[in-house]
Regions:
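Substrate-binding/catalytic cleft of secreted carbohydrate-active enzymes
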Residues: 1-206, 221, 226-231
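Catalytic cores of secreted or luminal carbohydrate-active enzymes
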Residues: 142, 147, 152-346, 375-377
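Short, well-ordered beta-strand segments
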Residues: 161, 222-226, 379-391, 434-436
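Beta-strand-rich structural segments
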Residues: 206-210, 361-378, 421-424, 434
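Low-complexity "stalk/linker" and mucin-like segments enriched in Ser/Thr/Pro/Ala/Gly
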Residues: 235-246, 390-406
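Extracellular Ig-like/FN3 beta-sandwich strand-entry sites
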Residues: 316-320, 362, 417-419
Length: 440
């Protein structure tokens, strides 16, 4: 109870707080104790409701809001339970206090399938919650990776539950949330388009994550298709993930011997196979295959050749994909995917004017290794040497290894006004300098 008092008195003037948690995390019911904690919270702050993180359904509700950790979703199950299955009082508000998290821990340096699935699972839950009008909202677990105890982590005591790493570098899943705002343009593609990253060289499902009015897709500067938000299967999200279902456009009609109607049928079939495998063609495509065989005397060898040419991206010149996000008729952001032909460091400090008051000031510096188009290189794990010059110092080691192509460091002031420079060096990605101004 004393801990609760101290928490509320210390933080009640923060406008970002919407609710006080007055239960011990995932604890069983204890009515006498929780009657006291609720009374204390309402006395010290009558303006905010109370809740408490639960791992049990239909428990005693002494708080204003029933809060529950809903970890139902495992990739195939529904995104969330309906309110009536969880709360013991359907007349009171219901809030999902955690979801995902340990159900699918994902590292920034995991393979592409896992990083993409991580993002899609967050979208699945968000869409499911948005479709339930009697659920007040939800909190994903969680925003950042964090250090933990012996029972979690991957042998390293790090919980990889975040949509960002510990230095606040975004994983792919962070874009799911970024898409739901309108101020900053967002455009992410869930694949690097490198076929060698995938089993059998099959890329599987690839999604566009964007908050634009539309996204135009080009392959080697040839227009393929324009994608719009209403094409997303996530009907309860304003800007849900959009499945890329066309890698061919009108190329078969223009370049091959098929008539327009049959070219489209062939392209549709190849695009479906592209998300699976040429060795496991869905039975629903058999009628199309039979028709093309009878009309054009096409055999499996020719099909394989066409697939390799238009889907597999093998053997020819390097394929370049470009995606243009359109807002109000203008291109607001572009993403280009092609085989990596250059690596460089990219770094950003959360602020470069350090100001001391009662203690030294600290700035977080995020570090990334990117290709020529600014795409993070998720398998770049090389060391970066960090040097501080002038009136600043580094907090932490002077050499770090990037993880998932990302990392970070902290810089602090030294108690004197002046200037400083942070120098980042990599043997394979060059160097970068960040200037700092210090005021005491």
């Amino acid at each position: 109870v004393q801990n609760l008092k101290e928490m509320i008195v210390q933080y009640r003037n923060h406008p970002s707080i919407i609710l006080w948690g007055v239960r011990i995390n995932e604890s069983p019911d204890d009515d006498p104790f929780y009657e006291k904690t609720n009374a204390v919270a309402h006395k010290l702050d009558p303006t905010r409701p109370t809740g408490g993180v639960r791992a049990i359904k239909k428990s005693h509700l002494l708080e204003d809001v029933y809060t529950y950790n809903d970890f139902l979703h495992d990739g195939k199950t529904p995104g969330c339970d309906p309110k009536k299955k969880v709360t013991s009082d359907t007349d009171k508000p219901y809030l999902i206090s955690e979801y995902n998290g340990h159900m699918y821990p994902t590292k920034a340096f995991d393979n592409e399938e896992r990083r993409s699935e991580h993002a899609i699972r967050h979208a699945n839950v968000l869409d499911a919650v948005a479709g339930q009008e009697d659920i007040a909202g939800s909190f994903g677990w969680c925003m950042f990776d964090y250090n933990t105890h012996k029972d979690f982590g991957s042998g390293d005591r790090i919980c990889y539950h975040g949509v960002m790493d510990m230095f606040r570098n975004p994983k792919l899943a962070a874009a799911i949330y970024a898409c739901e705002q309108e101020e900053t343009p967002v455009l992410q593609i869930t694949s690097s388009m490198d076929i060698g990253e995938h089993p059998g060289c099959n890329r599987g499902n690839i999604y566009i994550l964007s908050n634009a009015d539309s996204v135009k897709m080009y392959k080697n500067d040839r227009f393929i298709k324009e994608y719009r938000p209403e094409m997303s299967l996530y009907k309860h999200l304003k800007h849900g993930p959009i499945l890329i279902d066309d890698f061919i456009g009108d190329a078969l009609e223009k370049n091959e011997r098929f008539r327009p109607k049959h070219a489209k049928e062939m392209a549709d079939a190849m695009n479906i196979v592209a998300r699976g495998s040429l060795n496991h063609i869905p039975k629903r495509l058999y009628p199309t295959a039979l028709k093309l065989v009878l009309l054009y005397h096409i055999d499996f060898a020719e099909v394989t050749k066409l697939y390799t040419k238009y889907i597999g991206d093998w053997g020819g010149t390097a394929t370049v994909y470009r995606f243009d996000a359109i807002k109000d008729g203008k291109v607001i952001k572009s993403v280009t995917k092609e085989p990596v032909n250059g690596i460089r460091l990219q770094a950003e400090a959360d602020h470069t004017n350090l100001t001391e008051h009662h203690s030294y000031d600290v700035a977080l510096v995020r570090i990334r290794a990117v290709d020529a188009h600014g795409n993070v290189l998720p398998f770049y794990q090389e060391p970066v040497r960090i040097t501080a010059e002038g009136d600043i110092a580094i907090i932490g080691p002077d050499t770090i290894a990037l993880q998932g192509g990302m990392g970070g460091t902290y810089v602090k002031s030294l108690g004197r006004s002046g200037q400083g420079t942070l120098l980042l060096r990599s043997q394979t990605a060059g160097e970068i300098k960040i200037p700092f101004q210090v005021t005491v």
